[in-house]
């Protein structure tokens, strides 16, 4: 197998949270959230794919945003990955994960779904949004068998 070349790809500004560290919302001027069009996504995908072909690499994508699941063409993009046998990781938030979504992500080639935990409940919820801590723990446990995350101590932290 050819070595990987990784791309971190920001596909949308849309997000359910307003994290204090987030570059999208840090200046307070977020009235116009941006997302790539489907045409831009296809162009970007094929540019990355062609780059990897030229340099003998296997493309690997880290999808991020905002929350990539909120992009209107998110599932179309995953079909494109699947059609080209490209694996990926999602850097997202927990609010749109359920058993069915996790199974579909795995089927499309998702190897990991990164959820951030910024401390105990009070700190995490202050940093992200109220209720995020409990939702993150709940979804971390849901995603464990699908995405091979091993966090056995998480329930004890709540």
Show the residue positions of the predicted features.
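Short secondary-structure transition/capping segments
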Residues: 104-109, 138-144
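Conserved strand-turn element in the central/C-terminal portion of the radical SAM core barrel
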Residues: 139-158
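A short, terminal or domain-edge coil/loop segment
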Residues: 112-118, 148
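A short acidic, helix-capping loop that chelates divalent metal ions and anchors anionic groups
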Residues: 28-32, 121-128
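Charged helix-capping and loop-helix junction motifs
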Residues: 131-134
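Conserved alpha-helical substructure of the radical SAM core
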Residues: 1-112
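A cross-domain feature marking catalytic cores of carbohydrate-active enzymes
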Residues: 65, 90-94, 117-119, 153-157
